């Protein structure tokens, strides 16, 4: 996000125009049969990774808006539409998530090591993501107070989410020289490495019963691609063109790959039945630019396309009863590539 200080409170009905997000069907595209209604929650800027509080009355999300130059963390009250920035306004943030009970949130931030936004990736090397080494994981109250740094190891620590059991945090770290998944206790102790294959393991979420973890990964077995990966990683970059979805037990055992399509598959999240996973993929677009949501069984069978937007749909999360789904989308944007949050009433 940008190094600027927004007013802490934004009136969503004024600044975000929530009065037009009436939960109608006008935003639902043909073939999107799982959406009963669809309501737009944000209007303008870049808004993504919206995740419910455990009581499902609020969302935490990252946004670049107004005078911001890169993402900060915000909390939205779904009943009133009010939005509050809870991060410092310095550096850049990512990957916010509520603790069980909603007394705390976590997110990753660079503010303690840099006031300005981190440099953008150099696309002369092709399409890449930055794995900014200044990222550490922080906790705070949902109003942004009591900010506390949780990770202190050198290198990238981000992409953290919490088990519904309320006992462990899963996150991605480069502390051992590669991008692997780790878990830790809610106070940051008891760190344990779960993945060890060369490549980028990230974007992990627990199943609703806390027994499994779903994540996306790109692994490199041939020497040429491994060499390119290592070279980019030495510059704090990754090339996320081919990522597959994996599931494992919460202790890291019984890892299995469930997609094999060679596309960019990411943002997986468990359906409340713990037997299916919703995720984003560009598998249907030969050019690789159109991302839609898909459902798949945890054994890799039963792939079903959920959205049919021609640009981007991603970062889905269900409520615990499976009746609502929040996700980010480029649909209905006023300018190209604008990304907003949407809330769907879900039907099977």
Where do the language-model regions lie?
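Blade/loop signatures of beta-propeller domains
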Residues: 22-36, 135
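Residue-level detector of Asp-centered blade-edge/turn motifs that repeat once per structural unit
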Residues: 54-55, 100-101, 164-165, 208-209, ...
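A flexible loop/linker signature enriched in serine peptidases of the S9 family
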Residues: 43-46, 63-73, 88-93, 108-137, ...
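Predominantly a core beta-strand signature of beta-propeller blades
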Residues: 37-40, 81-84, 127, 134, ...
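Beta-strand-rich domains and repeat architectures in extracellular enzymes and scaffolds
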Residues: 26, 37-69
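Short loop/turn segments that connect beta-strands within beta-propeller blades
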Residues: 77-81, 141-145, 185-189, 249-253, ...
């Amino acid at each position: 996000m940008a190094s600027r200080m927004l007013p802490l409170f934004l009136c969503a009905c004024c600044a975000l125009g929530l009065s037009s997000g009436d939960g109608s069907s006008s935003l639902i595209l043909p073939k999107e049969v799982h959406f009963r209604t669809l309501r737009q929650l944000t209007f303008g800027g870049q808004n993504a990774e919206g995740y419910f509080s455990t009581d499902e009355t609020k969302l935490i999300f990252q946004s670049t808006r107004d005078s911001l130059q890169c993402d900060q963390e915000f909390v939205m009250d779904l009943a009133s539409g009010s939005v509050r920035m809870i991060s410092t306004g310095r550096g850049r943030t990512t990957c916010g998530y509520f603790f069980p009970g909603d007394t705390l949130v976590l997110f990753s931030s660079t503010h303690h090591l840099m006031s300005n936004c981190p440099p953008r990736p150099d696309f002369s090397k092709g399409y890449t993501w930055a794995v900014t080494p200044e990222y550490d994981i922080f906790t705070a109250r949902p109003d942004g107070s009591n900010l506390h740094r949780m990770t202190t190891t050198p290198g990238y620590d981000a992409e953290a989410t919490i088990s519904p059991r309320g006992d462990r945090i899963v996150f991605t770290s480069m502390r051992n020289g590669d991008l692997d998944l780790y878990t830790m206790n809610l106070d940051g102790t008891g760190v344990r490495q779960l993945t060890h294959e060369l490549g980028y393991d990230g974007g992990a979420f627990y199943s609703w019963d806390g027994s499994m973890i779903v994540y996306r990964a790109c692994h490199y077995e041939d020497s040429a691609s491994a060499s390119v990966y290592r070279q980019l990683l030495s510059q704090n970059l990754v090339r996320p063109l081919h990522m597959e979805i994996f599931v494992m037990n919460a202790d890291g055992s019984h890892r299995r790959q469930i997609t094999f399509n060679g596309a960019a598959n990411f943002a997986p999240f468990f359906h409340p039945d713990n037997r299916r996973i919703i995720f984003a993929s560009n598998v249907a677009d030969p050019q690789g630019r159109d991302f839609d949501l898909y459902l798949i069984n945890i054994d890799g069978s039963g792939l079903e396309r959920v959205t049919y937007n021609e640009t981007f749909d991603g970062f889905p999360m269900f409520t615990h009863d499976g009746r609502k789904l929040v996700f980010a989308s480029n649909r209905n944007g006023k300018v190209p590539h604008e990304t907003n949050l949407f809330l769907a009433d879900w039907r099977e």
